[in-house]
Amino acid sequence: MNGVAGRARDEFSAVSSSLPRFYPGLYDDFLNVLPEAERAQPIQAYFRRILDPSPDVNIPAARAWGETERILSEHEPNRTRLDQAALSSSRGTPATPFMEAHYFANNCFMKPNQLLRGAGRLQGIPGIIVQGRYDLLCPPATSHALSALWREAEIRFVEGAGHTLYDPGVRDAVMKAIADMASRISK
């Protein structure tokens, strides 16, 4: 596993609090995509807009969500602001925001803390969790909580990394985890 999103409300709280704290300009850009009346609950507003059937509504929201998430996923992003001109372009609209909005608007089709409450079912199954130390999307606390309940899981923190596989060390750590798991289960 690379980063764990198992407590949807906690992860959204983390994004909602880390975005204005670490990237205040990006947060302003993120809010400015929304009408003034929808800014009090921006995450829910984005879900509604991304899932709206009108491309005039869903494309700018999906682009803003996707780009904001990309910036938050990197430990040292190249850009820290949204490109306002690119938000309305229909070229290359990312699919991920549509899938995420559907799942997250439905609490990932899980009850609150279901992943952690059901961790006992993982007993006897080996696992490795690769976790970027500075992951703002899937905070390390969730991986830590899961590994504490899943005794056969090993958590490997990657220092100086966020969520993305493109951060230094994350891809290598994931590849090593795959090789280590293959070695373990082939015995």
Predicted features and spans:
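Short aromatic-enriched loop/helix-cap "lid" or pocket-rim segments at secondary-structure transitions
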Residues: D10-V15, G169-V170
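Active-site nucleophile loop of the alpha/beta-hydrolase fold
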Residues: M1-E11
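Short, conserved loop/helix-junction motifs that constitute active-site signature segments
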Residues: G120-G124, L149-W150
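Short beta-strand/loop motif that positions the catalytic acidic residue
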Residues: L122-Q123, I129-Q131
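Alpha/beta-hydrolase
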Residues: S18-G118, I125
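Conserved alpha/beta-hydrolase "acid-adjacent" motif
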Residues: K111, L136-T142
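Catalytic active-site module of serine/aspartate enzymes centered on a nucleophile-bearing elbow/loop
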Residues: A153-K187
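Active-site-adjacent alpha-helix of alpha/beta-hydrolase-fold enzymes
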Residues: P140-A153
